[in-house]
Amino acid sequence: MKKFFALVTALLFMMLSTAQAEIYPHCMPLEEMSVGGVGYGTSLGYVKKIYGEPVDKKIFTGDGVRVVTWIYSEYFSVTARTSAEDTTPEDNLQVVGYSLKTNALSTPAGLTVGMSYHKVVMLWGRGELVEDDGRRGYFYVPASSQLPVTLTFYVDANAKITEMQLGTDF
């Protein structure tokens, strides 16, 4: 009976592991979704300590949300979001996304704009294909969390990374 129970337990574990891999084949560690120290949940104040004041800001309040985007250049911006009623100072808002179009920053594993997407595939497997406004990209979700965040690697016709974009469903 003990052997039977052990066998059933092992089979269930294998089935669940396989199902998880089939549902989320495009995973990577959440820590690898950051660039230059900026990632999901980082405060805008921390971003400011690293990169200084942004050169421009875009603020949107409506539809129940307040969205603050700090623009450091045409190649790098960071976005935070909270509810429209939330009066938390900008510096304390948490990052929910960024856009990176330069190789000046990289992930902890060294991935950056300008590299071949195949380097990403070698580390984390092929991402889920997304086509957006005529652009082609591959997105990944955090491997060990239920956070609603994705990292998308947009590529050109030669599979060269042209942009890395962290974001949420909204």
PLM regions and their residue ranges:
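Right-handed parallel beta-helix
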Residues: 94-98
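Sec/Tat signal peptide C-region and signal peptidase I cleavage site
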Residues: 17-21
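Positively charged n-region of N-terminal signal peptides that target proteins for export
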Residues: 1-4
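A cross-family detector of function-defining hotspots
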Residues: 24, 28, 34, 42-88, ...
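Bacterial N-terminal signal peptides
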Residues: 8-15
